[in-house]
Regions:
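N-terminal alpha/beta PP-like core and its mobile active-site loop of ThDP/TPP-dependent enzymes
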Residues: 1-325, 362-365, 449-452, 488, ...
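Active-site diphosphate/adenylate-binding microenvironment
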Residues: 5-8, 23-36, 337-421
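Conserved structured core elements
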Residues: 25, 215, 256, 312-315, ...
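A general structural motif
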Residues: 47, 107-112, 180-192, 211, ...
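Thiamine diphosphate
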Residues: 104, 108-113, 259, 301-302, ...
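Phosphate/pyrophosphate-binding active-site segments
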Residues: 136, 287-376, 499-525
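Active-site-proximal loop/turn and secondary-structure-junction residues that shape catalytic pockets
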Residues: 163-165, 378, 524
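Active-site flanking residues adjacent to catalytic metal/cofactor-binding acidic residues
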Residues: 268, 294, 374, 429-430, ...
Length: 525
């Protein structure tokens, strides 16, 4: 007999899943029955929040959904922060949990791990939450999840299986293929957008995370129109060192001026989030008069109306738009405008920010093609303002949007397992590192060769600065850090401490040469 738990593993394999992150418990043992016989790799984090963040990092690095297995109740609630981050950043994540036996649900009988309404709670953060009530539901629920991931704006999905359903017979249930894809670009909208492009003299492209797989057509469109390309945080790595690239945040006044002076703005895969566009100051982000929006999500297009809205995958829409553009390529001043904006944007930054950006550039240059996974720490904040990365999708962090501390270490582990050929660096602070520091053990178990770079400024210095800026005496911002090198060594992981950031490049190369997890602590005044 094949149980529902065993069938789940078979169906996940059929959907292309090769890795799951999870901590087994008494309510999910049946989910593990089929794992030993499958090709799916199981990675055991030290906390379920780590499972969620690992699934997130895996998804961002690979482009495939990250999957987490967690127990009923506390195991699931521990993943909510990670699911919130995935929801904010449109990351495909499938969280599969147990739930108490069907006859007991909602009765408050005091069973182990019981919640009053687990699925109702998850519906508030997941794109959808589905309870399996019988074996025959399982293929359809999974097909719905994977169809959503490929056809619209992705995010976290939750499927729960009651303990009594997990052990039910599931012989004869079969895989349901998912043929769903994003909608085709509307021909009339493409034609209207092409007309706007043809008449534009000062166009600008805004690229968001939804455009990170569209580098080739995006580059051709930028060159065709002579349009500077502004990259939000999740789009960094596009058009690396290209003369039309502007790897700077629209929060900077120079970038906002570039956008304000444009006679056409093409926004590709960006939600216009306040943390990317400084919606909190300077009067908020002023939408341009002529705006073309390309987004896979209809809800996103509805939130900020445009002159022309195109619901489609960014790469497909841009290819369609290029096919409608006639005449010679632009010979305008796009490269001049881009260069002037880059120069002015850098001039806005303080010497401290500039030094922190140089530290990130040191990582990039020492390890070409690296994936740098950031936590909320000073050099990450600085680089989110201005930083040019050399790999599309290779710079991501949780310092914008939902802004969860502790994201970096487990997300970097997920990324390293997804793309084992790439160097992976976790850039974290001493405060944020302590949120998920035990995942060093998971990195060692999984042989994930993450280089953990710890920016140790002995506290929450960014929060301290914010307090001082508004006249609040700093309180609670100086938690004493441990000796990170000794902690790493306790896990069996090599570590070194740097007092001079000038030695960082050599340390990174030493770390990479080991092929193992490694900790580099940088002490900062």
């Amino acid at each position: 007999m094949t149980t529902v738990g065993e069938a789940l593993i078979t169906l996940l394999e059929a959907h292309g899943v090769d890795t799951v992150f999870g901590i087994p418990g008494v309510h999910t043992i049946e989910l593990y029955r089929g794992l030993a016989r499958s090709k799916i790799r199981h990675v055991t984090p030290r906390h379920e929040q780590g499972a969620g963040f690992m699934a997130d990092g895996y998804a961002r690095a690979s482009g495939r959904p990250g999957v987490a297995f967690v127990i009923t109740g506390p195991g699931l609630t521990n993943t909510i922060t990670a699911m919130g981050q995935a929801r904010a950043d449109s990351v495909p994540m499938l969280v599969i949990s147990g739930v108490n036996a069907t006859p007991t649900l909602g009765k408050g009988l005091g069973h182990l791990h019981e919640l009053p309404d687990q699925r109702g709670m998850m519906e508030k953060v997941a794109l959808f939450s589905h309870r399996i009530t019988g074996a025959d539901e399982l293929p359809g629920a999974l097909a719905r999840a994977f169809s959503l991931f490929s056809s619209s704006r992705p995010g976290p999905v939750h499927i729960e299986i009651p303990t009594d359903i997990m052990v039910e017979p599931a012989d004869g249930i079969s895989y349901l293929p998912t043929n769903a894809g994003p909608p085709e670009p509307d021909a009339a909208a493409i034609a209207e957008a092409a007309e706007l492009c043809a008449s534009a003299r000062r166009p600008v492209i805004l690229a968001g995370g939804g455009a990170k797989k569209a580098e080739a057509p995006l580059k051709r469109l930028a060159e065709r129109l002579g349009a500077p390309v502004v990259q939000t945080t999740n789009a960094r790595g596009l058009l690396y060192r290209h003369p039309l690239g502007v790897p700077a945040s629209p929060s900077l006044k120079a970038v906002r001026a570039l956008i304000a002076e444009a006679d056409l703005v093409i926004a590709a895969g960006t939600e216009f989030g306040p943390t990317d566009y400084d919606g909190y100051g300077d009067g908020g982000f002023v939408p341009p008069a002529n705006l073309i929006r390309i987004d896979i999500g209809a809800d996103q297009l509805a939130r900020r109306p445009a002159t022309v809205s195109i619901q489609a995958d960014c790469a497909e829409a841009i290819e369609a738009l290029l096919g409608r553009l006639d005449g010679p390529a632009a010979s305008g001043d796009g490269k001049i405008r881009a260069a002037a904006t880059r120069k002015a944007a850098l001039a806005e930054l303080s010497p401290a920010f500039t030094a922190q950006i140089r530290a990130v550039e040191t990582i990039r240059d020492a390890l070409p093609g690296a994936i740098i996974v950031g936590d909320s720490t000073q050099p990450v904040y600085a680089a989110n303002l201005y930083y040019d990365h050399d790999r599309p999708g290779g710079w991501f962090n949780a310092a914008t949007g939902f802004g969860a501390l502790g994201f970096g270490p487990p997300a970097a582990i997920g990324a390293a397992l997804a793309v084992p050929e790439a160097p992976v660096v976790c850039l974290t602070g001493d405060g944020g590192f302590q949120f998920t520091l035990p995942e060093l053990g998971a990195a060692l178990d999984a042989a994930a060769p993450v280089i953990f770079v710890v920016w140790n400024n002995r506290g929450y210095r960014e929060i301290e600065t914010s307090m001082l800026d508004v006249g609040v005496e700093p309180v609670g911002v100086s938690p004493a850090p441990p000796d990170f090198c000794k902690l790493a060594e306790a896990y069996g992981i090599a570590a070194e401490r740097l007092a001079d950031i000038g030695h960082l490049a050599d340390a990174l190369k030493r770390a990479r040469a080991t092929g193992l997890p490694y900790v580099i602590e940088i002490t900062v005044d």
